[in-house]
Amino acid sequence: MRKLLALVLNVALRASLVLFLADAILNADDSRFAGKGIGSRGLVILPLSLLLPALYLTRRRGEPYPFWMDNLYLSIFALDLAGNSFDLYNSYRHFDLLPHAHGTGAATVLFAWLLQRPMLSAVGLATALHVGLEAQEYYSDVLFGLANVRGTWDVVNDLVVGVVGSAVYGAGYLWLVRARGAGGTT
């Protein structure tokens, strides 16, 4: 039953990515999407959404497909895109703190699991990735006139909640791994 639920959720997440991106492209002038470069992001998000299946096919053949980890990975993109489609970024000033906390926290777990690295290393990798993403958001606004960042306070708060997300998700993952007696370097 858990495998079926994981598969259904995986298909739903993948379908939601396509639907959210189609909505953003077809309604690019809508205030939910205007000035955010979501169509361009889609060119990056869709190929990135296939990263875990590609890694599985090349490195983990013979093992069961890690649907729950793939779902965690896909949820990073789905939450970000849902925030735009449902106009949450514009309606709630601090909504973006949720995707930043979740995205960095989820990346921490994925790095620890996928790379079999100690949790502190995974936190460092996820935080470095998050700093790079935040810099990309800021400089795409400055250089290309987009509207993803509301000011320095927005950048600082996004980075702070990213670190908090890494700590919370990392601690949760360590607890689950230990509770299940699973192996791996964490």
Residue spans of the language-model regions?
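"…centered on the first transmembrane helix and the immediately adjacent amphipathic helix/loop
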Residues: 2-102, 109
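Generic alpha-helical structural signal
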Residues: 3, 73, 127-130, 151
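Physicochemical signature of membrane-embedded alpha-helices that form the seven-helix bundle of GPCRs
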Residues: 5-9, 129, 157
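Membrane-proximal helix-loop-helix units in multi-pass membrane proteins
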Residues: 82-138
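Interfacial helix-loop-helix junctions of multi-pass membrane proteins
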Residues: 87-96, 131, 135-167
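Membrane-interfacial alpha-helical segments at the cytosolic side of multi-pass membrane proteins
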Residues: 102-117, 142-148, 163-176
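Membrane-interface capping segments at transmembrane-helix boundaries
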Residues: 174-185
